[in-house]
Amino acid sequence: RNQNTLENIKILGTIHKLHNENTNYTFNHIREAIIEFEPDIVAIEIRNRDISEKNEYLINYYPPEMIQIKEEFENRITVVGFDWRGEDLENEPIEKWTPSKADLSKYEDISNLMKRRKKIMNDFYKTCSIYECQDKSKLQELELIEKELNVVLLGYGQGKLIQYKKDREAIMGNNMLKIIKDNDGKKVIVITGITHVLYLYDRLLCSRKNMNI
């Protein structure tokens, strides 16, 4: 059951607002997984510059379970952030962030891909256990839809949005590896939305191979 675990590092995928609907994978399961792993560091999907912000601010921009983890564990374990929301916001509050306003669901091919993704979320992630949610075959299905979506988006002139998503994931990976490197020998649990799990785990594996570990 040591899914997505390598030596002292564990990557745990979460399902954001679906935790409120999925009785098999609630915040209690996240809490238990953290306690069971006994980490020295908890890395969550919040920008590190926002870690010290109040909940009233965070709740508008970040997944609820990330805020709950921060609130519950920051007084007993080191909690750090590894998210990224764009170069323009490097030292800016996140309220200046302007996500894409384009309504892309009006295009049938995009709409069909979004429906396929939503069906997986509804059929699987609303009922799966914490262990089933980390299942690689299901994550690969979502990844495949994302790749197809990017091809279609490119056809609608959305190259900037695709680049932003790629940059975000790459920098999240860089930030994660820096946290691990800066805390060499310590136990680190990385908590992220399920759609980032495969990428981050691959980055972790590659970094270990390069270090001949």
Predicted regions and their residues:
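Zymogen propeptides
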Residues: 2-35, 49-51
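Generic beta-sheet signal
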Residues: 9-10, 186-192
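Hydrophobic, often amphipathic alpha-helical segments used for membrane interaction and targeting
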Residues: 41, 50-185, 194, 202-203
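C-terminal domain-boundary segment and adjacent tail
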Residues: 196-213
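General small-molecule cofactor/ligand-binding pocket signal
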Residues: 10, 80-82, 212
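Proline-aspartate-enriched helix->loop->beta-strand connector
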Residues: 34, 38-44
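Active-site-proximal beta-strand/loop segments in catalytic clefts of secreted hydrolases
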Residues: 12-15, 45-47, 82-85
